[in-house]
Amino acid sequence: MSPPGGDATVGSDEKRQKGKATPDTIKMGCIAMVMKEGQLRRAEILSIKDTKSGRQFYCNFDNFNKRLDEWVPAARIDFEQDVEWPNPDKDKQKDAKTKKNNSTVSKKQPSKKNNQKKASKREQSVASDGQTPHPWTEFVESQPGKNNRQRGKTEDGTDVNASLEVGGDKGVKRKADEIDMDEDEIPAAKKQRQPSFSREQEIEKLRTSGSMTQNPTEISRIRNISKVEFGRYVLFPWYFSPYPQIFDQEDCIYICEFCLSYYGELKSFVRHRQKCTLHHPPGNEIYRDDYVSFFEIDGRRQRTWCRNLCLLSKMFLDHKTLYYDVDPFLFYVMTTRDDRGCHIIGYFSKEKESTDGYNVACILTLPQYQRKGYGRLLIQFSYELSKIEGKLGSPEKPLSDLGLLSYRQYWSENIIDILLGYNERKEACTIENIAVALAMTTQDVEHTLQALKMQVYHKGEHKIVVPEKLIKQREKSKAKQKRLIDPERIQWKPPVFTALNRTWGW
């Protein structure tokens, strides 16, 4: 499989055996012709599962983005054509390697005494929640407790993250040791050793190239949910999300658009909707205009709701790998209103106290609202809050591929507007002036200027030049721009937290 955000090329250049197959004999690693968008396309079978509607096959289509992988029924596979079978020699090598890895892991098993200590700590954490047991609790308790307590460090010590995704949110989309699927659910793929980077090199790489997760297991993880019914919309997830394993067998899961509770049975979901009394996110409304509202939710006060929001967003963010510890975060949820209530459009989260100066930890616009200008509103709102705080902010890296594009567009448009204003007044402008005016970090300003090739060195001085082409592009985008955040409507003061409110909830 290709990394997130890239186009997948199915199979390798090696010759494969071809032959007939049936729904019962086809296996993982086979390449077959699968119907997609009315055409037969070459696809690799990465996983197989039995659902209530029958056997389904997880297909990675040739030259298609990873997020377009999907579960398909046997009826969409053309079994009249020969399929390409995986190389048997490689299967033997893989089996031998798997056995070797299993034996190595067994030697490094922690002592029974340590396991008991970890289990008791997890029990105390659940008890301190002060809420009824949740299906997610059982799933978390089955995972290694130590790994989940690590605060956003990769193996090379790098702080990262969505996630959308985007993203991938320390404790919400951070690259800590993630909750993995069983080994037999990981597809047969080459796992190359990832190059090691220093902290500065890694941040620079992620800043300029978008969301490319550095964890090979995360890349090869199979999407487990096929379809989601969310309010009036049917959503098709892009990535794996760690809902309880029992939901893997469902053809569709049902999520309440107000409280975000999830159900596998339609009857249970209908019963819940009749009893659910929530009609807006469980927080304070801090902004309202004719189009949207913003709610501020404290992750410590609304743990279950925020955890459910993280599970929902993980389906559309490739790098969001830690979902349980929401206590140190504030969630800002954007909604649209009608007579039924407030419907979630998207959200961003931020740390209650960020040592790195991040004003966004995770940001996502739900797929049904993308390409409508809502992502820009989320970004603008995050910077308006930074202006009220009197700080310079920056989103936590890495951004998802779509998040990176949205931020670059927002940065470039606002920087051009600032520069044109200085030019009209015939005033000198520096990078620091731009950063303060937009509440951006000087590093983000400088990277944007370099990406747009607006920094030049002339007669011994560094100068900022705005090409005529960019000015015309900005004028066109202004004509299309419909919605903006009105800073006068924001009813918000920077919250003050005690040390207890800022800590993790273990």
From Swiss-Prot:
A motif (ESA1-RPD3 motif) lies at residues 303-324. Autoacetylation at Lys-320 is required for proper function. The record marks C362 as: Important for catalytic activity. Residues 109-120 have a biased composition (Basic residues). InterPro entries: Acyl_CoA_acyltransferase, Chromo-like_dom_sf, HAT_MYST-type, MYST_HAT, Tudor-knot, WH-like_DNA-bd_sf, Zf-MYST. Its EC number is 2.3.1.48, 2.3.1.-. Disulfide bonds: none annotated. Residues 220-494 form the MYST-type HAT domain. Its main location: nucleus. GO terms for cellular component: chromatin; NuA4 histone acetyltransferase complex; nucleosome; nucleus; piccolo histone acetyltransferase complex. Residues 26-78 form the Tudor-knot domain. The ESA1-RPD3 motif is common to ESA1 and RPD3 and is required for ESA1 histone acetyl-transferase (HAT) activity and RPD3 histone deacetylase (HDAC) activity. Catalytic component of the NuA4 histone acetyltransferase (HAT) complex which is involved in epigenetic transcriptional activation of selected genes principally by acetylation of nucleosomal histones H4, H3, H2B, H2A and H2A variant H2A.Z. Acetylates histone H4 to form H4K5ac, H4K8ac, H4K12ac and H4K16ac, histone H3 to form H3K14ac, and histone H2A to form H2AK4ac and H2AK7ac. The NuA4 complex is involved in the DNA damage response and is required for chromosome segregation. The NuA4 complex plays a direct role in repair of DNA double-strand breaks (DSBs) through homologous recombination. Belongs to the MYST (SAS/MOZ) family. This is Histone acetyltransferase esa-1. It comes from Neurospora crassa (strain ATCC 24698 / 74-OR23-1A / CBS 708.71 / DSM 1257 / FGSC 987). The gene is esa-1.
